[in-house]
């Protein structure tokens, strides 16, 4: 059965698959660049 969970940062869509939950379309963060990236 489809699930929709509302979180402070947005909505998370998933599915209840009789015994386990499956998350779909989880938003990802942008990669760290510039001053936010690790330095050697």
From Swiss-Prot:
It catalyses: a carboxylic ester + H2O = an alcohol + a carboxylate + H(+). Keywords: Hydrolase, Serine esterase. Coiled coil: none annotated. Its EC number is 3.1.1.1. Signal peptide: none annotated. Transmembrane segments: none annotated. GO terms for molecular function: carboxylesterase activity. The keyword Hydrolase applies. Belongs to the type-B carboxylesterase/lipase family. This is Esterase-4. It comes from Drosophila mojavensis (Fruit fly). The gene is Est-4.
